[in-house]
């Protein structure tokens, strides 16, 4: 942030050097220099702070880049970028600015309904709302408003789903341009809804395919070696799979809830309501019910595959924990054995230190005293070490109390578990 002091009106851009004038004419170089401000007040009356997001230079148009942050935020709250398709599938408006109040008035929506489609809010909860004359959908990268003769697609450019939405626009345009007879005489809104569900299922399927390949290769590597890097990678994939499973489960739950609401299913026939002016009977929604059930089963299959993959990861984690516990127990046993051997050697060192005090004990002139004492020390040290190691081995032979109480064989051979009458 740079402190800028206002200039007098006598100072003009023409008085600057050619380099300065070129910098003012090309906005991308303006951030590298100190930008003066032309004010109507007296010089040095006010102080202004100029930033890249709020350039205080007169003569430039007020755009989203040049306007103050508060003004840009207000515009973002009042406007929404949308792409509109007409009843023939042609793009009527590309990334146009629509006022939220106008959208609510034209489509009979409430502000809380439109909030669920707000692209500035990062929401992972999918939504399918059926309103009078429209269907609001928020699934993954698609946020759309379906009517009987138009589709309003809310842009999410700048996010991680921009590429997916760009592909979906071409798919939606192609399907809406086709005749209803090509889709079994489905009305306009059903074709748009089916296109959205196809895109959502394909996105989930492709993401699951990538995760499945990555996780399968990683689990295969665990059979060869377990190291810290692979454990860290397994943790990352486990988090990604958990998030994907939650996302797919929420979509399946939304479709299940919609299938249980007969009133919403009947209200999704927007073309018939527009022509007759009356809502469809509650018991006549076979087409949309079959449509939703088909894609609900596909999403449920994706959820089951993801759940199985998560189960494989958890099984691998449990096996890794068992192997790590076994290695840790082996190290503990080795430490106990070394401690037992150290105890025997320590006893021998104590006896040797007693003889090293240079005191008379009556064995100085005995011809075999040295050999007898040395042999006794080594024998007793070996006895203590062997006794400690035997005690440790007995700890390894402790069996589960279930085998002793039920008189079950300890062997894991399936033939030993057969009943006697077979």
From Swiss-Prot:
Homopentamer. Forms homooligomers. Interacts with MFM1. CDD domains: Mrs2_Mfm1p-like. It comes from Schizosaccharomyces pombe (strain 972 / ATCC 24843) (Fission yeast). GO terms for molecular function: magnesium ion transmembrane transporter activity. One of its GO terms (cellular component) is mitochondrial inner membrane. A motif (YGMN) lies at residues 355-358. Keywords: Ion transport, Magnesium, Membrane, Mitochondrion, Mitochondrion inner membrane, Transit peptide, Transmembrane, Transmembrane helix, Transport. The chain crosses the membrane at residues 331-351, 370-390. Its main location: mitochondrion. The keyword Transit peptide applies. Belongs to the CorA metal ion transporter (MIT) (TC 1.A.35) family. It is found in: Mitochondrion inner membrane. High-conductance magnesium-selective channel that mediates the influx of magnesium into the mitochondrial matrix. Essential for the splicing of mRNA group II introns in mitochondria by affecting mitochondrial magnesium concentrations, which are critical for group II intron splicing. It also suppresses a variety of mitochondrial intron mutations and its absence may disturb the assembly of mitochondrial membrane complexes. Gene3D superfamilies: 2.40.128.330, Magnesium transport protein CorA, transmembrane region. This is Mitochondrial inner membrane magnesium transporter mrs2. InterPro entries: MRS2-like. Residues 1-49 form a transit peptide.
């Amino acid at each position: 942030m740079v402190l800028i002091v206002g200039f007098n009106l006598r100072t003009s851009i023409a008085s600057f050097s050619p380099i300065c004038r070129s910098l003012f004419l090309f906005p991308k170089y303006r951030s590298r220099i100190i930008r003066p401000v032309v004010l109507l007040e007296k010089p040095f009356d006010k102080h202004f702070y100029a930033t890249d997001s709020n350039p205080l230079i007169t003569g430039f148009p007020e755009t989203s880049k040049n306007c103050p942050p508060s003004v840009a935020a207000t515009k973002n709250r009042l406007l929404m970028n949308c792409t509109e398709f007409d009843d023939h599938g042609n793009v009527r408006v590309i990334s146009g600015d629509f006022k939220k109040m106008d959208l609510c008035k034209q489509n009979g929506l409430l502000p809380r309904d439109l909030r669920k489609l707000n692209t500035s809010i990062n929401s992972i909860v999918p939504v399918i709302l059926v309103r009078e004359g429209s269907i609001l959908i928020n699934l993954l990268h698609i946020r759309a408003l379906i009517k009987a003769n138009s589709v309003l697609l809310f842009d999410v450019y700048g996010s991680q789903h921009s590429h997916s939405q760009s592909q979906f626009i071409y798919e939606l345009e192609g399907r809406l341009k086709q005749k209803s007879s090509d889709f079994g005489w489905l009305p306009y809104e059903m074709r748009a809804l089916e296109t959205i569900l196809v895109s959502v299922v394909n996105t989930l399927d492709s993401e699951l395919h990538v995760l499945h390949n990555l996780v399968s290769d990683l689990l295969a590597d665990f059979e060869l070696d377990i190291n810290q890097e692979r454990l860290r990678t397994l943790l990352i994939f486990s988090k990604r799979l958990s998030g994907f499973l939650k996302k797919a489960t929420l979509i399946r739950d939304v479709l299940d809830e919609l299938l249980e609401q007969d009133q919403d299913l009947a209200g999704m026939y927007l073309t018939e309501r527009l022509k007759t002016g009356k809502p469809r009977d509650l018991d006549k929604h076979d087409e949309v019910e079959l449509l939703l059930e088909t894609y609900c089963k596909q999403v449920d299959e994706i959820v089951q595959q993801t759940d199985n993959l998560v189960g494989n990861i958890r099984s691998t984690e449990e096996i890794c924990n068992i192997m790590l516990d076994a290695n840790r127990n082996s190290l503990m046993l080795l430490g106990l054995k070394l401690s037992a051997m150290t105890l025997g050697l320590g006893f021998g060192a104590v006896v040797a230190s007693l003889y090293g005090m240079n005191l008379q004990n009556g064995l100085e002139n005995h011809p075999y005293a040295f050999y007898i004492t040395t042999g006794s020390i080594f024998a007793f040290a070996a006895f203590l070490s062997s006794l400690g190691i035997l005690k440790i081995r007995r700890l390894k032979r402790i069996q589960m109390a279930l085998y002793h109480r039920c008189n079950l064989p300890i062997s894991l051979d399936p033939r030993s578990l057969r009943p006697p009458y077979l």
